[in-house]
């Protein structure tokens, strides 16, 4: 289950594989089976602690313009034209059919499709 979690103001993490302490602290606050979907302070969607996200919408497969880290599967899908970037916000979640979690080990074809998260945005 995805849980909305706000990133700190100015948070930049181009190398989320190098120092995972922030992500570990967030995960420690969640229940078993919950995964944080990070939201920037302006309400724009980012990604999770270990995947990029793709929203399944009526307009096709959309991914946030500014992920924390662009993964190889994310780049491959963009270059192939299978997904497109959009200025996605929390409000867009209510209109999507689901959220795919993708990374190098989970290509879109076999990626889990989760229901959009509901509820308030949590903060550290």
Predicted feature descriptions by range:
Residues 1-124:
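Helix-start/capping segments and mature chain N-termini
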